[in-house]
Amino acid sequence: MKISIGLGKEGVEERLAERGVSRRDFLKFCTAIAVTMGMGPAFAPEVARALMGPRRPSVVYLHNAECTGCSESVLRAFEPYIDTLILDTLSLDYHETIMAAAGDAAEAALEQAVNSPHGFIAVVEGGIPTAANGIYGKVANHTMLDICSRILPKAQAVIAYGTCATFGGVQAAKPNPTGAKGVNDALKHLGVKAINIAGCPPNPYNLVGTIVYYLKNKAAPELDSLNRPTMFFGQTVHEQCPRLPHFDAGEFAPSFESEEARKGWCLYELGCKGPVTMNNCPKIKFNQTNWPVDAGHPCIGCSEPDFWDAMTPFYQN
């Protein structure tokens, strides 16, 4: 079976117009990505140029040990909605959850994508089980460890999407019987150096922003010591939090049902991990609408290594 990889009309603008998406809406999306990247609205035309080539970027999305919450974060996104993102902006050539193909046809699509002369970007969701030669996780009778070991070294760029893929996440919580690891820990012997987009779930704008940066610069963005892009993970949640003035004033909510909590006082005494968590949640929010602290819940430190072990109990500081 021959499957079209990364092809379309002249460019993304024409494909979007055919689907009723205006240039204005497309530039609005590009502006949101530019702001997420810390470049400001003036950078939106550069984002547009990176996405408007005649060939859409081919993306291979692999699933390992996970709950599919990271995929849900993309599927629930708007501006653009997921159909616009995967049909007109990117060429998502393999994604087990949403692809139409199944069985042998799905495997054929994967093989064609990873062997395309035009190359591909790999996005990985979920921790990689490594114990007992990876026997705890299989797809199409191949261990997830074997699949990632075979495919990821071929990719032009590898993006570990979500805390399970970056640091092991809940899959690696003690006692971790499956030996689950993040991509870089599991495959460092193969020279794989994934860009880590941490979060449980991660923000889809951080994923698209990373892809845009790579398309424009043909290189990974500046990374911190944990391989996270500093344009998204360069500050703590605490430093960007709208409740920071209350922290500085020593005004802490004593309980969730208190009047102080309703007034927006700091949630540090209720377990907020914002001071030790690097992420841009207060800046971009989810769907540019809300994020946990604005909704009255403490940050649980989900974008940090070992957060299921190191950050619990969640409601103690």
From Swiss-Prot:
Please state where this protein is localized. Periplasm
Q: Which species does the entry assign this protein to?
A: Nitratidesulfovibrio vulgaris (strain DSM 19637 / Miyazaki F) (Desulfovibrio vulgaris)
Annotated [3Fe-4S] cluster binding lies at C281, C299, C302
What does the record give as cofactor? [4Fe-4S] cluster; [3Fe-4S] cluster
Supply the Gene3D superfamilies for this chain: Cytochrome-c3 hydrogenase, C-terminal domain (4.10.480.10), NADH:ubiquinone oxidoreductase-like, 20kDa subunit (3.40.50.700)
Q: What enzyme category does the UniProt record give?
A: oxidoreductase
Q: What is this protein called?
A: Periplasmic [NiFe] hydrogenase small subunit
Signal peptide residues on this chain, from the entry's feature table? 1-50
Entry note: cofactor: Binds 2 [4Fe-4S] clusters. Binds 1 [3Fe-4S] cluster.
Sorted alphabetically, which NCBIfam families does this protein's record hold?
Answer: hydA, TAT_signal_seq
Q: Which domain of life is it from?
A: Bacteria
Q: Name one GO biological process term.
A: anaerobic respiration
Gene Ontology MF, one: ferredoxin hydrogenase activity
Please name the PANTHER family in this protein's record: HYDROGENASE-2 SMALL CHAIN (PTHR30013:SF7), NIFE / NIFESE HYDROGENASE SMALL SUBUNIT FAMILY MEMBER (PTHR30013)
The residues that the entry says bind [4Fe-4S] cluster 1 are C67, C70, C164, C200
* EC assignment: 1.12.2.1
Any idea which positions bind [4Fe-4S] cluster 2?
H238, C241, C266, C272
- Post-translational modifications: Predicted to be exported by the Tat system. The position of the signal peptide cleavage has been experimentally proven.
* Reactions that this protein is recorded to catalyse: 2 Fe(III)-[cytochrome c3] + H2 = 2 Fe(II)-[cytochrome c3] + 2 H(+)
| Subunit annotation | Heterodimer of a large and a small subunit.
Matches recorded under Pfam families: NiFe_hyd_SSU_C (PF14720), Oxidored_q6 (PF01058)
Q: Name one GO cellular component term.
A: periplasmic space
Chief subcellular location: periplasm
Mind telling me which PROSITE patterns this protein's record contains? TAT
